[in-house]
C-alpha cells in the first residue's frame, strides 16, 4: 500500500543548486568497440565525491543538454556526467526523419536494439572513466525518455527488444518513462529490485499523443521497496529536457531527486515533505 503526498517548490532549494556546479568539462572516451563517446563532466565543488551520476539523454539529445540535472547532481556532491549517444543522437534522428514522418522516424529509433546496445556501451565507458575522478563506488543512472527506457532496461525491466540489463547501478531516476507498448510488455517491471524514482507530468504525453498516464505503468508494476512516483502539474515532455517554459519543472525535478537521495540514508525510505506543484506516491 502506498501513500500519497503533494509537493510545492522551495525557494531555499532553488538557491542551493542554481549555478552551483563547480565546472563543466568536455571529455572524449573510448568504449569497448573502439568508438568514441562524448561526455560533459560536471565536477563537484565539495571536498569528497559522493559517487557518479550518469545522465542518459532522450532521442536526439546530446552531452550538451540536461545541464540543470547535471548541475543539480553536482551541487549534491556527485560527479555528474551527461553522455552523448551517437546511435540515437541528433544526427541519428535526422537520418530517421528522411523519408519518414516525425512519429514514424522516432518510433523506429526508440525501438532499435542496436541503438540501445550503443547506449549501454557509452554508459559503461563513462562509468569506467569516472573511477579516475571519484573514489566513491556509489553510482546513479538518470535518463529521460529514451534514456528512461535505457535506465529501466539496465535496472532489469523485461522488454520486447531482446535486451538484458546488467543492473550495475545503486539506484535509478527515470523522467518520462515508457509504459506498456512497443518497448515494454505487461508486467515488464516486476523484477526491478533497486530503488527507483519516476517523474512525469500531467502534460507529458506519449509519442503520437497517448496519455501521460501510460507513464505510470512502471511504478504500478514494480514491487515495493523504495519506489517513488512524482507527477508535476502541467509539466510537458520537453520541459524535462530543459526546453520551453521549464524552470519550474526543472526545480521540482531536482528537488525531488534530492529528497529521494536523502531518503536512502533513512530507515524506510521516508517520503518528502508535502510541496505544491507535484504529487508523490511511494511504496
In which residue ranges do the predicted regions lie?
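Bacterial N-terminal signal peptides
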Residues: 8-18
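Serine-hydrolase catalytic machinery in alpha/beta-hydrolase-like enzymes
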Residues: 29-135
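The feature captures the conserved acid-bearing segment of alpha/beta-hydrolase catalytic domains
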Residues: 164-234
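Alpha/beta-hydrolase-fold serine-hydrolase catalytic core, especially in secreted/extracellular enzymes
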Residues: 234-235, 242-283
Amino acid at each position: 500500500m502506498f501513500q500519497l503526498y503533494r509537493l510545492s517548490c522551495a525557494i531555499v532549494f532553488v538557491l542551493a543548486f542554481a549555478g552551483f556546479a563547480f565546472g563543466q568539462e568536455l571529455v572524449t572516451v573510448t568504449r569497448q568497440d573502439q568508438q568514441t563517446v562524448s561526455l560533459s563532466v560536471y565536477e563537484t565543488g565539495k571536498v569528497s565525491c559522493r559517487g557518479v551520476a550518469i545522465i542518459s539523454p532522450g532521442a536526439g539529445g546530446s552531452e550538451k543538454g540536461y545541464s540543470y540535472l547535471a548541475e543539480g547532481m553536482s551541487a549534491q556532491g556527485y560527479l555528474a556526467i551527461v553522455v552523448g549517444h551517437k546511435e540515437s543522437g541528433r544526427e541519428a534522428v535526422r537520418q530517421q526523419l528522411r523519408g519518414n514522418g516525425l512519429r514514424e522516424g522516432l518510433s523506429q529509433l526508440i525501438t532499435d536494439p542496436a541503438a540501445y546496445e550503443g547506449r549501454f556501451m557509452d554508459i559503461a565507458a563513462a562509468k569506467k572513466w569516472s573511477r579516475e575522478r571519484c573514489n566513491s563506488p556509489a553510482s546513479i543512472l538518470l535518463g529521460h525518455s529514451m534514456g528512461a527506457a535505457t535506465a529501466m532496461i539496465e535496472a532489469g525491466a523485461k522488454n520486447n527488444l531482446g535486451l538484458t540489463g546488467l543492473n550495475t547501478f545503486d539506484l535509478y531516476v527515470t523522467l518520462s518513462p515508457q509504459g506498456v507498448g512497443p518497448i515494454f510488455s505487461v508486467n515488464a517491471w516486476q523484477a526491478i529490485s533497486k530503488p527507483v524514482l519516476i517523474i512525469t507530468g500531467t502534460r507529458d504525453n506519449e509519442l503520437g499523443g497517448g496519455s501521460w498516464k501510460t507513464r505510470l505503468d512502471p511504478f504500478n508494476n514494480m514491487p515495493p521497496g523504495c519506489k517513488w512516483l512524482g507527477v508535476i502539474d502541467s509539466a510537458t515532455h520537453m520541459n524535462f529536457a530543459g526546453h520551453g517554459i521549464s524552470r519550474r519543472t526543472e526545480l521540482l525535478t531536482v528537488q525531488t531527486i534530492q529528497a529521494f537521495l536523502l531518503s536512502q540514508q533513512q530507515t524506510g525510505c521516508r517520503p518528502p515533505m508535502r510541496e505544491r506543484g507535484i504529487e508523490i506516491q511511494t511504496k
